[in-house]
Amino acid sequence: RGPNPNDTYYDMVDLAPYLSKGKNEVKFLLWYFGKSGFSHKSSGQSGMIFDSPSIGLVSDSSWLSQRLDAYRTAGKPVVNYRLSEANILYDARLEGQDGYKPSVELGEWGCKPWNNLILRPIPQWKDYGIKPLEYTVSNDGEGNTILTARLPYNAQMTPVIDLDAAEEGVLVKMETDHIMGGSEPCVRAEYITRKGSQKYESLGWMNGDELRVIYPENAGITFNSLGYRETGYNCEREGSFTSSDETINRFWEKAMRTLYVNMRDTYFDCPDRERAQWWGDVTILMGQSFYQLSPDVNALTKKAIQTHMY
């Protein structure tokens, strides 16, 4: 969660584009992992520090907060122990049933569990926007309908579903063809419907070449659309290569995609099973990035070197 096992990164965000003249209401959606992994050491407690003195907005007891019970942890199979996050389950039946309560001040800047706060050295993710997917419909022979959509390449993405449900309580599962990347369970998602029309984006990113949505046959579900939002490290492709051999050209493109899908808040060995900064993998990725990506990638390289000692 930070530059070392004890301290914490903070983000600097420009609120101006989100504010309008007059009264504004500011809301944050906080995801507390509640577990450690190869790339994250849990603080043991959820919390938020916010400080914008120029507009008199600070994170004190005047804030109201609520635990969103609609967000839960999905059942088995759970993610393997290497991953920092858990699989998200969202129960749409519980939307809007949570009440706000006064927040509790946990301590000042520099106190536990945050300790020293260090400005995050890399940019926020590059958001490519929501894009539609074409899909096929099949049955698995075990009572389930499966929507299968081919992604344009192996991407870091969040799935977006738009459907009508005749009844509430239908479990919809979302996963990719990399669900067992490296032979152990990786990130997937679950959604429980409410009755009527609904649209949902699962915010836990996953990766793969193919998105699959699974739900019971004859459950009264009608899908209106299926989509995805790709996000990734915020840089541009600048290096290029071409030849008269299409096989070599395709190989170069696949190598470029392999590089990009293995970088986010750090370089990592794989985007599915571990997402961890194994140095043997990092040195290969860093060397490639200098040739293929814009100088924005240098911030990620510097961060990798600085955190290597931990």
Explain the meaning of each model-derived region:
Residues R1-D272, D281, D296-H308:
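Extracellular/oxidizing-compartment recognition motifs
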Residues I284-P295:
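Well-ordered alpha-helical scaffold segments within catalytic/enzyme domains
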